[in-house]
Design a protein with these regions (language model features):
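Conserved "landmark" site that anchors the functional core of diverse proteins
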Residues: 1-168
């Protein structure tokens, strides 16, 4: 949506998002869980690239449906790759923004877009191509047998696979 190269870094926001004040003009896109993005307190689009001007504030709230939103900024977040990835691995303290989640007041380094991003505003993912996000709470998940699945007899496997489960 913003024209970044494959492997360009963005922000993954789990359950709630940040409030970001932009120091320069940028083209951004928010996808994934609906975190009701707002630009200077007004609703901002999801699944569509749009321009944020220097001094404006983009805020992502709490996820209404889904768990994770993704914020892409034209040019990409400019962090060094670690083990071939720009992702943050919190438990190991590596990658991303010095191995930790963003902190209040921390500047996010954004690379310059190679060919200027202004013309990319307005691109969108059509509704038919977006993953379905519904309030449905009954999910069918796949099970992969583990290395000790032979500890359970055939009747136990059948009972496990035919039962309804409540995840808490």
């Amino acid at each position: 949506l913003v024209g970044n190269a494959p492997g360009g870094a963005g922000l993954e926001c789990q359950f709630s998002g940040p409030t970001l004040r932009f120091q320069r003009d940028a083209v951004v896109a928010v996808t994934g869980a609906d975190m009701a993005p707002e630009l200077d307190g007004m609703p901002a689009p999801m699944w569509r690239s749009f321009t944020v001007r220097a001094g404006q504030t983009l805020a992502l709230g709490f996820a209404r449906l889904g768990a994770r939103s993704y914020l892409a900024i034209a040019g990409g977040i400019n962090t060094p790759p670690v083990l071939g990835s720009r992702a943050t691995f919190h438990q190991a303290g590596i990658g991303g923004m010095e191995g930790h989640a963003l902190k209040k007041g921390q500047a996010v380094p954004v690379a310059e877009s190679a060919d200027g991003a202004e013309g990319r505003a307005g691109r969108q993912v059509i509704a038919a191509r977006r993953p379905p996000l519904t309030g449905e709470k009954n999910w069918q998940i796949e099970v992969v047998p583990g290395p000790n699945d032979d500890w359970i007899d055939e009747a136990g496997h059948a009972r496990f696979l035919s039962s309804d489960w409540l995840l808490q």
